[in-house]
Amino acid sequence: MPQLAGKLILAGLIPLGAWVLHGFASCNGLIQMFEDFGKQTVLSDGVTDYTGAFTGLEGLDRLLRTLLNFFWPVANGHDWALSLHAFMFAGQGVPLLVLNMLEGARPGNKSLVVSYVTVFGILYMVVGLAIMAPLYLFLHLLTSRTATAPSKAKVAVDPNTAKAVGFGVFVGYVLPTIFMSLPHPSLLSTDTKVLSVVFWQAVPLWASVCAYFASTALGQSATSRSSSNLPSALGAVYAASLIIATATHVATFAISANLSDTWSGIFTFLIPPNPFNTDMRISSFLEGATWFLQWDYTMMSLAYMVWAIGIRHGVEVPRSSHHFETLGKIALRSMAKLLVMGPIGAALSLVWERDQLLWQLDSESGEKGEKNRSRRMSRKWMFS
């Protein structure tokens, strides 16, 4: 029942995400500004010249110019509220990529549409997380065997694959994000800064490519499914992702508290405007980019929290078991995690819990089976 509710919520978030992201942007004037900047050789700050030709393919270059103009103020710290939001968003990007890439590697998702995580990652960047995140997660709950009938065998990830995912996210996402954020012209020339922002648009691809080569070099581990404990490599990837997500989330609010005069002001940078007020107009491109990013983050967060709670509750546990938790208790714990780790960090934590629970249940089932076999052998010996 909770997963059915999750599917319905996620299905409803898809058109809502389309409106708050693109419909609202069209009404408030941001889309028109995008189109205007796409025709110019000056970036969205109004002063930086650039060529705008990156690949020689006009259609692709037009898309890259649009993304570049959007992320240019984000990468340059032109506004403290936008910079804070982008910093927090970037931190949540680590568990986001880890979650998706691990889903692509799970046996229960093999050959399913949700295993094509690189394609979905690019669509996240191009179409927007507010639309593509609920769509991907809806398809996951609908089709994935790790969601419909979870078991240790279906969610098990080879330890070396887990290491490769961690390596891929660090080299393909974390490093490009840090490099893109370096100031110009003090550390980066304008041309280098522009190219770094353009390069960053394909971080889901770079992360997947790096993970592929790392996985090929490491090979397959022989202990991925035979161990009675969750592989330490997988746990290490989960833990590292949560450390980054938590550190950036807490640091964001600490900085905001230092910059704000009131308690309510701490959360101002996070709260998006009413998307159904079609009379609202942006006063600048910077303001429009901030609103866009706020809604992208909000919808993504809601989608992943709904999905993760459904995934965690989807493990069948008898009510008599000490592992059993009600949906309400899981939801309350999830909200507490969200406050500390951020939404995607909380979602990853719930998936980690799910994995650990499946390993424990499998181990207990094996021990129970071994005891039953021992009893049968004892009876057979007594009456022989």
Swiss-Prot record:
Listed EC numbers: 5.4.99.-
Transmembrane segments: 82-102, 119-139, 164-184, 194-214, 235-255, 291-311, 330-350
Protein's UniProt name: Terpene cyclase ascI
UniProt entry keywords in alphabetical sequence: Glycoprotein, Isomerase, Membrane, Signal, Transmembrane, Transmembrane helix
Cellular component, GO annotation: membrane
S-S bonds: none
The organism of origin for this protein: Acremonium egyptiacum (Oospora egyptiaca)
Keyword Mitochondrion: no
Glycosylation sites: N109, N258, N372
GO molecular function: isomerase activity
Catalysed conversion reaction: 16-hydroxy-ilicicolin A epoxide = ascofuranol
Mutant phenotype after disruption: Impairs the production of ascofuranone and leads to the accumulation of the product of ascH.
Practical applications according to UniProt: Ascofuranone is a specific inhibitor of trypanosome alternative oxidase (TAO), and quickly kills African trypanosomes in vitro and cures infected mice. As an essential factor for trypanosome survival, TAO is a promising drug target due to the absence of alternative oxidases in the mammalian host.
EC top class, as a word: isomerase
